Amino acid sequence: MSNRTSNTTVEPRGSEVENRENVLLLRRQSVPEHESNPQERTKATQKKKKKKPKVRWTEDVVDNEDMNKKKTKICCIFHPQRNFDDGTDSDHSHSDSDSSSDSSGDERGGHEGSSRGPDGGNDSKKIVDGVKKEPIPNAYEYQPVYKNESKLPPGINDER
C-alpha cells in the first residue's frame, strides 16, 4: 500500500484548475469539427451499421405459440387447455366395456402405443374390440408435410 493521501477539493464553476495533471474530465471540452455537423455524424453511423439480411416467412411457417417467434421447425408443442365444463366429456366412463370412447390413453393413466405384450416388449399394434389399430404417433414423432415450392429452371431434370 502506498502512503499517499488524496484530497478532494470542489472548485467553484468558472475557476481554472491550475494542476490539470490530477483532474479527471468527464465531458469533452471541445467537439472535433468533423463531428459537429449532424449530417456527417449520421452518415458515419450509417456506414458503421451493417445491413442484415431480412428473412421473409411464408404463411405455413410455425408461429411458436403466438409469441411472434417464427421458426421453420417445431421446437415445442402447445396443447391448449380444454374446457371441462362441457357435459359431454364428464359423462365418460373409464371402464373397458366402453368402446365408443375416443379418449387418449393419458386420461386413463396409460399412453397410446405403450401396451406391453406377453414377452414384456412393446407391441406395434394395439388391440381394441378385437381389431388391431396402428398407434398414433405423438406430436414429436409425427413428421409434418412440407410443400416444396422451389422451381427448377426449364431444361433441368426433364427426364421425369
Curated annotation (Swiss-Prot):
Ranges of compositional bias, category Basic residues: 44-55
Domain of life: Eukaryota
GO cellular component: nucleus
Signal sequence, start to end: none
UniProt GO MF annotations: protein phosphatase 1 binding; protein serine/threonine phosphatase inhibitor activity
Keywords: Nucleus
Compositionally biased tracts (Basic and acidic residues): 30-43, 82-97, 105-114, 122-135
Sequence similarity: Belongs to the YPI1 family.
PANTHER family: E3 UBIQUITIN-PROTEIN LIGASE PPP1R11, E3 UBIQUITIN-PROTEIN LIGASE PPP1R11-RELATED
Listed name of the protein: Type 1 phosphatases regulator YPI1
Origin species: Scheffersomyces stipitis (strain ATCC 58785 / CBS 6054 / NBRC 10063 / NRRL Y-11545) (Yeast)
Lineage summary: Eukaryota, Fungi, Dikarya, Ascomycota, Saccharomycotina
